[in-house]
């Protein structure tokens, strides 16, 4: 299970000491990546430069309400600092307003900025209908994104087995599906993987892989 996990710390009050611990835990447990806010990308890339742990960061986070130009710049800047993977929040207002062409153009622009780097599109599934989730999956696939992702972990809910199944059924085997938000136990993580998740974002990653109860609340 370890290699499914993006070991995550996205809190506003995260300290460098906590980020160092995150990196060291990811290295020790061989998690797929660390997922951190953009300001820590360069630091994590340097700390993990002799490991296989990837550097994942978030764009337009957590509301998705930045303009496309800002998201493109964020993406380019993060990659220049050492990011391997980009988790971008879709504009939820545009989804609710049905501005599908605008959404698709934004994803295309950000994927172009990513180049060969991997792009995940965050939906915030707790705010959407199943129909909207399916529509976003199809748009993300057509726009060239590599993954679809459930949640930021900062809204009214996180990943559910039902949404993971729906997303996997929609995108097929050609794309990744990331479960994030509220995945805090080994049993929950395994349920997400069994439902079709190819990546799991979690702050309780060490507890998940050791089977121990998480000691704090988090992503």
UniProtKB/Swiss-Prot annotation:
Write the Enzyme Commission number(s) for this entry.
4.1.2.4
Q: Which GO terms describe its biological process?
A: 2-deoxyribose 1-phosphate catabolic process; carbohydrate catabolic process; deoxyribonucleotide catabolic process
- The main location is cytoplasm
Query: Which terms in the GO cellular component ontology are assigned?
Result: cytoplasm
Query: What name goes with this protein?
Result: Deoxyribose-phosphate aldolase 1
**Disulfide bridges in this chain:** none
State any single GO MF term: deoxyribose-phosphate aldolase activity
Described function: Catalyzes a reversible aldol reaction between acetaldehyde and D-glyceraldehyde 3-phosphate to generate 2-deoxy-D-ribose 5-phosphate.
The protein's matches in SMART domains, at most eight in alphabetical order, are given as: DeoC
Q: Where is the active site?
A: 87, 149, 178
The places in or outside the cell where this protein is found are: Cytoplasm
* Signal sequence region: none
State which pathway it belongs to: Carbohydrate degradation; 2-deoxy-D-ribose 1-phosphate degradation; D-glyceraldehyde 3-phosphate and acetaldehyde from 2-deoxy-alpha-D-ribose 1-phosphate: step 2/2
């Amino acid at each position: 299970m370890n290699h499914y996990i993006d070991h995550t710390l996205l809190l506003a009050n995260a300290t460098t000491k906590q980020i160092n611990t995150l990196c060291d835990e990811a290295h020790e447990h061989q998690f797929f990546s660390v997922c951190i806010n953009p300001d820590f990308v360069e630091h994590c890339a340097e700390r993990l430069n002799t490991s296989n742990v990837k550097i994942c960061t978030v764009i337009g986070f957590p509301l998705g309400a930045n303009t496309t130009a800002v998201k493109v710049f964020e993406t380019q800047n993060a990659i220049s600092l050492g990011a391997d993977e980009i988790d971008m929040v879709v504009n939820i207002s545009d989804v609710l307003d049905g501005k599908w062409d605008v959404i698709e153009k934004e994803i295309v622009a950000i994927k172009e900025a990513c180049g060969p780097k991997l792009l995940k599109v965050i939906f915030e599934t707790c705010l959407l209908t199943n129909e909207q989730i399916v529509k976003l999956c199809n748009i993300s696939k057509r726009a060239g994104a590599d993954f679809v992702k459930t949640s930021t972990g900062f809204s009214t809910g996180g990943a559910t087995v039902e949404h993971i199944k729906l997303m996997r059924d929609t995108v097929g085997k050609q794309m990744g599906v990331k479960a994030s938000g509220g995945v805090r136990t080994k049993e929950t993580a395994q349920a997400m993987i069994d439902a079709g998740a190819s990546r799991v974002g979690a702050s309780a990653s060490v507890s998940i892989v050791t089977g121990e109860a998480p000691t704090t609340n988090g992503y």
